[in-house]
A protein has these predicted regions:
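C-terminal cap of metal-dependent C-N hydrolases
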Residues: 49, 66-112
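Short, solvent-exposed mixed-charge patches
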Residues: 116-117
């Protein structure tokens, strides 16, 4: 196992082709869980935090902190328990790229969450 030897393993691939279109990288995270023994949270961290470190932007890319790039996905559910949630666009509640919403959360989203709990 590469990880046991201290080698970082990150998801990624050649996207943008007919047989592997953009937007399918969440499928790779599920493969990391099912085939490589990652927990869902480890797969998410490999794709985000470790990816930011690999790209030379530790602390700014792949993390949620003040001063970091604001690229966020808010989903209905807990992907740390069920990684497949990230493959279901119907569960995407909000999408933010560079601090701008590409899909804004519903106005009543917070109220629905509080009422459900």
């Amino acid at each position: 196992d590469l990880r046991k030897r201290g080698i970082r393993v990150l998801p990624g691939g050649d996207y943008g082709f007919k047989w592997n279109p953009h937007g399918r990288n969440a499928r790779d995270l599920q493969m990391f869980v099912e085939l490589f023994g990652f927990s869902p949270l480890e797969a998410i961290q490999a794709a985000t935090q470790a990816g930011g470190e690999l790209m030379g932007e530790p602390g700014r890319l792949g993390v949620i902190t003040q001063g970091a790039f604001a690229d966020l996905l808010l989903v209905d559910g807990d992907p740390s328990k069920d990684i497949a949630i990230l493959q279901d666009p119907d569960r995407f509640l909000a999408i933010m790229k560079d601090g701008a919403f590409h899909k804004e959360p519903a106005d009543n989203l917070a109220g629905q969450r509080v009422a459900a709990e």
